[in-house]
């Protein structure tokens, strides 16, 4: 079964999507599945080959709002490459222009729309949530819901990584939604990587002793991640308890994040962690992951933290909230800095060690990516086979 993933969100400097698609190549079983990642790039060509497939790029322009990324703009060229690749299954992982291009491709492949992004949460709900309810916002963005319902009719399947997103898509009128949760890279994240000396060094960067509570934040410095809100909440919580925050990341919102952290010596900003083993060690060595974004469809870093035995302090909405387990951290009202500050205070007062002990016990049960891909490939084989027979 040849699967072509038309992946508009892939970039060499990318985060969760890059991790996801590169693991997909490793999960494909030669002789059973062949995975071709078709990504926008600087030039036409093959940029990586694995036993289970390859990453192929189509020459495209840069995305003007984030120049790390590119976007598909030539439908004829995309159709021509799909003709040459002749997939049995074609996936699209962007809800914008590329799925409409794939829907118009005349090939006979099984079509799957994978919801790696949730634009309504990332943009509309964030921009207008302070002045209107979600129901009102949805009515204002009915053009986008009509677009999604049209794609639902044109595609054979819509894949969602979390039940909360699936429920919202179904409520919006989509009828082909299947929830297939993602997972973490196998063999990397573990509570056994905990390093007390590293924990002490990170707290020292925050000007705090090892007796303080160490919170870790990881992610792009972008407005939807709400890092200034997180910093504000950590600062407020720090008036009653010694709490340090180490935030690893980079992005277009860096100047705003730096300004937010300027007045708190207990907040340290670090560069992105590119080495996966180092990331796993940092996660296992902290006392909790703190997260401000409610717009992710899955929240890979929260899953990686859980697999590392790390409690979560996360919003009650979106992919991060779906990762939460009672007794292993705190959940707070999304978009509310006062609620986040109260959650941090409650976490510290409620014994971080006890929260971590429960999280360590649960860590082995966090699903890995290979299980996700095995289920995804099996679903394609079953549904695609029936669809082909029906055709």
Residues covered by each model-derived region:
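Carbohydrate-associated surface elements
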Residues: 41, 164, 183
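Membrane-proximal helix-turn-helix segments that form the acceptor-binding/catalytic region
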Residues: 119, 137-157
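Conserved donor-binding/catalytic core segment of Leloir-type glycosyltransferases
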Residues: 203-204, 209-225, 231-234
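Nucleotide-activated donor-binding/catalytic signature segment of Leloir-type glycosyltransferases, i.e.
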Residues: 255-277
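Conserved acidic donor-binding segment of nucleotide-sugar-dependent glycosyltransferases
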Residues: 269, 326-337, 345-352
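Aromatic "clamp/platform" in nucleotide-sugar-dependent glycosyltransferases that forms part
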Residues: 294
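Short hydrophobic beta-strand element within catalytic cores of glycosyltransferases
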Residues: 311-314
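A charged, aromatic-enriched C-terminal amphipathic alpha-helix characteristic of glycosyltransferases
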Residues: 353-385
